[in-house]
């Protein structure tokens, strides 16, 4: 009966127009104009609720096939597919707005337009404003709310998290032994293997104390592909190296079966013509990255972009991660076999110290489920290769269902920049965490964290399990023995919630609060001494140089093997991609220190910049604000001063966004406040811009040219009056160099003049 009812609802929906569906969804009933008047009198039906869902289900099957579809059922039918319909309508409305000069009045609503007062914001926006601030404030404190859950992706986290409990003994390191086929190869590699050299390195207490107080020794090198590298270390004499012209797989000490499977897994990057093809099974970029990874130094690579080399980088760090896990587990299993065959004497246990305080040894932090899916697929491919015998992957179907996506879900008419399409591909839910256990040629997905070798999670997924001070349910012991931390696409976390990343780093490699059944006779001494952070390798990948990302790398990465950072400087800048003829006025503000920059920028803006735009002649002014907290401060100030403005942020409802864009285009609102996070997640083209103010330089340099090029969307002969003003300080050196180039940025920061003019688009 339930199937018949759903068919009836779907048939009913198929006969309704889009306007009827919208009215039904908004008001819970159809418009009276479309009422179907039945000539027969319908008797009222009295329904009694059953005590259990089972009895109600059995009774419903005995009912007749014909039933009266009430307005309530029609509403439920629309709500069932509301997300899909809203997405389709949203994209269609966007396309219409991109093609037309004005927004369709029916999308805005005549009654809402007539009731809009010139000096006040839209009522719907006002009701959402109180929750906006509360939601965003709660992100940093409680990690709850809308962080990262932008309109493109809604969290799919269920109340009950699934974990695999069936295969515990099969993947246990305590009860399994090394297979004969891989046992011999392991012992042959121990002497020169960089893995063994790293974990067997013994630090002294004096070295730890000296490293805490002494500055790091640095040395700069230039590599053919990576470019300018900075080697640094606090623990040992500076050792640098240059990549050889070609490398042999055997010299890399890859664990079986990676020597044979890597070539096939990486073949997609080697099949093309030109210099990418190499006999070493690595691309030139992968070769240099893996040489640094395999030396167990920390690495910061800020040129990983989803559009250009994202998959290339993902392949090489997955190879390093699974190589590390296979070696670590092979050592444990080999020692299990040795302990079983020989009798232990007094003090012999020190020869078998091969574990940490907890089993998880690799943590991979990625922003979306799609990235986690690709990482697991790479692990399967690296273990399987050309082998005719398929490896065992438990819960694979469930994993693909929860982390995969339906290609038909994305509207075909969606037009966005290529970099947007590359980032927001597949399942973009940002709340997830999954444990992966690997034992020789078998993979266990959804393994309990304390039975896992590799943890794959988003910052939000980790934040909700780590918890905060005072919370009853919190757990971070699984982070105590992480030996390899991979943070991929770090720039996206700036658009989600960077506080989650800082919270994670503050809980890395702490002593566990519980033993979790560990055999202390097998735990390495440096782990017992709470020195795990000095043995942890951190690989940090992002698309840009940013002060917050640099701070994490400099503060939290203290690997005894040293650090390597790629420090290439942009020579041209994104301002060269501005196509419109536009004067760019860069105004430098002064601040005593980094802590006072926020207040200095605000007072400089309201005292020096804003008075120039209060005149009605300077209408159609867009103010681009990268920080949400600056946005809230400006919004409150504009309200206090009763300025004629509207605003769009990442929490504004879709209807509010449409109205704000319409009012700004028509000139009914003089100012439009726009957050960078909204632009990152939506990439709307804001029409009607004549004056542009960058309250702060954008995080992504290419956003500068994108926003500037929006001025040509509604060109009506006002090109001569267009203006662009940019605020910057000496603390914005990296962002300034990314926009104007490193040479111009140096001149602008050192010049006694505080105002600099650039003109683009000249013929």
Swiss-Prot record:
GO molecular function, one term: U3 snoRNA binding
Entry similarity comment: Belongs to the UTP25 family.
Coiled-coil ranges (or none): none
Cell compartments where the protein resides: Nucleus, Nucleolus
Gene Ontology terms: cellular component: nucleolus; small-subunit processome
Gene3D superfamilies per record: P-loop containing nucleotide triphosphate hydrolases
Matches recorded under PANTHER family: ORF PROTEIN-RELATED, U3 SMALL NUCLEOLAR RNA-ASSOCIATED PROTEIN 25 HOMOLOG
Protein name from the UniProt record: U3 small nucleolar RNA-associated protein 25 homolog
A Pfam family this chain is assigned to: UTP25_NTPase-like
Post-translational modification: Phosphorylated. Phosphorylation is required to promote p53/TP53 degradation in the nucleolus which promotes cell cycle progression and liver development.
Record's compositionally biased regions (Basic and acidic residues): 25-43, 54-70
Task performed by this protein: Component of the ribosomal small subunit processome for the biogenesis of ribosomes, functions in pre-ribosomal RNA (pre-rRNA) processing. Essential for embryonic development in part through the regulation of p53 pathway. Controls the expansion growth of digestive organs and liver. Also involved in the sympathetic neuronal development. Mediates, with CAPN3, the proteasome-independent degradation of p53/TP53.
Compositionally biased region (Acidic residues): 84-119
GO BP, sorted A to Z: embryonic organ development; maturation of SSU-rRNA from tricistronic rRNA transcript (SSU-rRNA, 5.8S rRNA, LSU-rRNA); positive regulation of embryonic development; protein catabolic process; protein destabilization; protein localization to nucleolus
């Amino acid at each position: 009966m339930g199937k018949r009812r759903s068919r009836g609802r779907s048939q009913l929906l198929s006969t309704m127009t889009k306007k009827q569906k919208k009215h039904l969804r908004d008001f819970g009933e159809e418009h009276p104009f479309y009422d179907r008047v039945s000539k027969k009198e319908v008797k009222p039906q009295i329904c009694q609720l059953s005590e259990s869902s089972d009895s109600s289900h059995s009774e419903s099957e005995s009912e007749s096939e014909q039933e009266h579809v009430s307005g309530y059922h029609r509403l439920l039918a629309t709500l069932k597919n509301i997300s899909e319909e809203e997405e389709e309508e949203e994209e269609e409305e966007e396309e219409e707005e991109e093609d037309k000069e004005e927004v369709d009045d029916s999308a805005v609503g005549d009654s809402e337009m007539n009731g809009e007062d010139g000096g006040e914001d839209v009522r719907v926006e006002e009701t959402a404003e109180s929750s906006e601030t509360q939601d965003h404030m709660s992100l940093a404190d409680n990690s709850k709310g809308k962080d990262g859950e932008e309109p493109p992706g809604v969290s799919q986290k269920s109340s009950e998290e699934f974990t695999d409990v069936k295969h515990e003994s099969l993947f246990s390191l305590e009860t399994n032994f090394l297979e004969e086929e891989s046992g011999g190869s392991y012992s042959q590699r121990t002497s020169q293997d960089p893995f063994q050299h790293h974990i067997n390195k013994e630090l002294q207490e004096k070295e730890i104390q000296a490293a805490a107080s002494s500055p790091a020794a640095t040395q700069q090198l230039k590599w053919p592909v990576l470019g300018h590298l900075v080697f640094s270390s606090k623990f040992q004499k500076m050792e640098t190296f240059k990549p050889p012209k070609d490398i042999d797989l055997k010299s890399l000490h890859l664990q079986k079966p990676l020597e044979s499977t890597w070539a096939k897994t990486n073949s997609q990057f080697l099949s093309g013509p030109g210099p990418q093809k190499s006999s070493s099974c690595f691309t030139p970029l992968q070769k240099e990255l893996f040489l640094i990874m395999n030396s167990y130094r920390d690495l910061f690579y800020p040129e990983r972009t989803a559009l250009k080399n994202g998959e290339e980088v993902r392949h090489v760090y997955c190879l390093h991660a699974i190589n590390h896990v296979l070696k670590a587990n092979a050592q444990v299993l080999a020692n299990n076999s040795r302990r079983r065959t020989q009798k232990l004497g007094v003090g012999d246990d020190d020869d078998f110290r091969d574990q940490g305080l907890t089993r998880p040894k690799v943590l991979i932090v990625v922003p979306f489920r799609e990235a986690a899916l690709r990482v697991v697929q790479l692990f399967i491919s690296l273990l399987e290769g050309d082998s005719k015998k398929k490896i065992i992957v438990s819960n694979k179907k469930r994993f693909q269902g929860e982390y995969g996506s339906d290609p038909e879900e994305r509207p075909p008419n969606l037009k966005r920049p290529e970099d947007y399409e590359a980032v927001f591909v597949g399942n973009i839910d940002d709340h997830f965490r999954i444990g992966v256990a690997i034992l020789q040629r078998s993979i266990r997905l959804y393994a309990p964290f304390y039975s896992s070798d590799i943890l794959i999670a988003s910052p939000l997924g980790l934040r909700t399990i780590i918890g905060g001070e005072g919370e009853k349910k919190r757990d971070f012991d699984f982070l105590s023995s992480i030996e390899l931390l991979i943070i991929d696409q770090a720039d996206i976390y700036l658009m989600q919630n960077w506080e989650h990343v800082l919270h994670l780093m503050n809980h890395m490699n702490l002593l566990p609060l519980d033993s979790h059944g560990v055999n202390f006779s097998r735990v390495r001494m440096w782990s017992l001494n709470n020195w795990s952070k000095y043995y942890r390798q951190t690989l940090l990948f992002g698309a840009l140089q940013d002060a917050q990302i640099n701070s994490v790398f400099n503060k939290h990465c203290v690997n005894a093997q040293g650090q390597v950072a790629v420090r290439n400087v942009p020579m041209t800048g994104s301002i060269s991609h501005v196509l419109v003829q536009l004067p760019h006025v860069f105004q430098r503000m002064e601040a005593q220190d980094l802590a006072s920059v926020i207040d200095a920028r605000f007072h400089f803006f309201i005292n020096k910049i804003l008075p120039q735009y209060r005149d009605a002649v300077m209408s159609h002014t867009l103010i681009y604000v990268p920080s949400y907290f600056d946005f809230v401060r400006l919004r409150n100030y504009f309200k206090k001063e009763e300025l004629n403005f509207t605003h769009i942020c990442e929490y504004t409802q879709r209807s509010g966004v449409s109205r704000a864009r319409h009012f700004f285009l028509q000139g009914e609102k003089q100012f439009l406040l726009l957050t960078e996070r909204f632009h990152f997640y939506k990439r709307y083209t804001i029409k009607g811009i004549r004056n542009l103010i960058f309250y702060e330089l954008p995080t992504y340099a290419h956003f500068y040219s994108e926003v500037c090029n929006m001025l040509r969307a509604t060109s009506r002969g006002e090109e001569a009056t267009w203006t662009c003003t940019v605020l910057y300080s000496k603390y914005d050196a990296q962002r300034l160099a990314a926009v104007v180039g490193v040479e111009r940025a140096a001149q602008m920061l050192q010049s006694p003049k505080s105002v600099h003019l650039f003109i683009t688009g000249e013929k």
